[in-house]
Amino acid sequence: IMPSLVGSEMCIRDSHNAAECETTGRSRDLALLPWGVMSEENYMRIIDLRGKKLTRAEMLEAMPRAEMGTNEATELVQPILDDVKARGAAALRDFAEKFDHIRPENLRVPAEAMKAALDELDPEVRAAIEESVRRCRAVSASQVPAPFHTDLAEGARVAERWIPVQRVGLYVPGGKAVYPSSVIMNVVPAQAAGVESLAIATPPSRNNSDGLPDKTILATCAILGVDEVYAVGGAQAIAMFAYGAKGSEPQDGEILCDPVDKITGPGNIFVATAKRMVSGIVGIDAVAGPTEIAIIADKGANPSWLAADLIGQAEHDELAGSVLITDSEELADKVQESLRYRVPRTEHAERVNTSLRGRQSGIILTDGIEQSIDAANAYAAEHLEVCLLYTSPSPRD
């Protein structure tokens, strides 16, 4: 018997699928609730959909979701936007000191620092980055839409031409980990589209006494030929891109950063909120929440690999969502076992533990591949991984 908090009710787990609620004295099916069933020995809660014919609304309700707290984020972000708009670089340095615990001397990364980072980059890491760039360029080139026109009558033509945005601000997160992949996935599509002016903002690294960003990030920027890089993170970086920033120190110049036409890139809830709040004056790609992954797997999948992928997503952020969808209870148990071994040994164990145990993560048990697909579509994850040993041709190809 295990107490489990479901909404505002304290429930006692007494069977595989049911709970007796102390507050009402009646049985409620936990499988339909986002919180599911959790035990102290396991890292991830179980959401059991087996044997249930769910409506679309019930399926959506059963999915694990985080509570974002956007109202609180808005109240915190608005003063940051206002201060950067009013004071420019001076505000950026103050916020770096407050949030990143370092005060960068150079907000714009000097060219010599970029070159030094590239020269010092491990050859194997450089080779991996260059291969990632090559692959991303191949995909991005195929995504550029072709112009077209239709002649309706003599002198009457309807046409569409795709014209690149002139200047784009690219945000690369870096407060909790290093993401050269975010540099690549921001820069390469913009270059393929023909954007002429690219500026990157990424947080200063606490590991660098000079307040510059992580050297791998700088080296990746150098490989891609981007030389306008700022040691600025968080909502203040979004404000800098949206409004521009006047200089406050001699090394800044009169204008530290010109405003951009569009802002792209991932970030935490404060970055996402800032992008939403400036979207009326500058274009944005999307208001993305914390990163998430859904994995559809059957009994043939390797539980250790699945656990590693769930951990890899969870280490991004305490609110990151990691969801396993499977029709094999045996596989689910083995994944939990692997997590019990792996999580305490990972570098960011505390963050991973919080993420995996959060209401945004869980293991969804299904009757089969068809229901697994329905659950994956309802969850609609940012990243979808499919690990199936065998399936018939019919399940949605």
Task: Give the positions of each predicted feature.
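Short, low-complexity intrinsically disordered segments enriched in A/P/G/S/L with frequent Arg
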Residues: 22, 30-32
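Single conserved hydrophobic/aromatic residue that forms the stacking wall/gate
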Residues: 1-14, 390-397
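Conserved NAD(P)+-binding/catalytic subdomain of aldehyde/semialdehyde dehydrogenases
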Residues: 226-321
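Flexible, acidic loop-helix segments that line cofactor/substrate-binding pockets
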Residues: 107-122, 287-293, 316-332, 337-365
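Conserved C-terminal structural/oligomerization subdomain of aldehyde/semialdehyde dehydrogenase
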Residues: 357-392, 396
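N-terminal Rossmann-like NAD(P)+-binding subdomain of aldehyde/semialdehyde dehydrogenases
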Residues: 39-166
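Conserved small-residue-rich beta-alpha loop and adjacent elements
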Residues: 150-219
